[in-house]
């Protein structure tokens, strides 16, 4: 539900997009001070991140035409976050890649970076 989403911004600088979660953090603090349940805030947080990731992917797709998204890293050990992110990206027509053999963690990111670097270097 969109009424459960927390605020975030996407900024652009030097041909890079940046997700700014400062508005989200401020809202979470306000909600905690107002006595909102931690479970509701956690739910809103987990539902907002996939929408933020989709917004970022959409901005990049509009600029580049790229339609593939690769998900990796420690945050995707969280099944709720992973499933919601894949669902949002799928719904928007992205081709989503998620590893099945390697463990979900930063080591997978390092391997991906090495593969990309290797593809650019002619040995």
Where are these regions (language model features)?
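Short alpha-helical "patches" and their helix-cap loops
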Residues: 64, 68-73, 122-123
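Conserved phosphate-binding/catalytic loops in two-lobed NTP-binding clefts
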Residues: 68-69, 79, 85-109
């Amino acid at each position: 539900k969109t009424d459960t989403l927390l605020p975030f911004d996407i900024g652009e600088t030097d041909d890079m997009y940046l997700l700014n979660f400062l508005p989200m953090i401020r809202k979470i603090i306000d909600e905690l001070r107002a006595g909102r349940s931690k479970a509701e805030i956690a739910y809103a947080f987990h539902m907002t991140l996939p929408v933020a990731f989709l917004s970022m992917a959409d901005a990049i797709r509009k600029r580049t035409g790229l339609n593939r998204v690769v998900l990796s890293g420690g945050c995707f050990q969280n099944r709720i976050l992973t499933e919601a992110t894949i669902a949002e990206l799928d719904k928007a027509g992205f081709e989503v890649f998620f590893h099945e053999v390697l463990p979900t963690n930063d080591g997978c990111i390092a391997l991906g970076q090495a593969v990309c670097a290797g593809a650019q270097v002619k040995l």
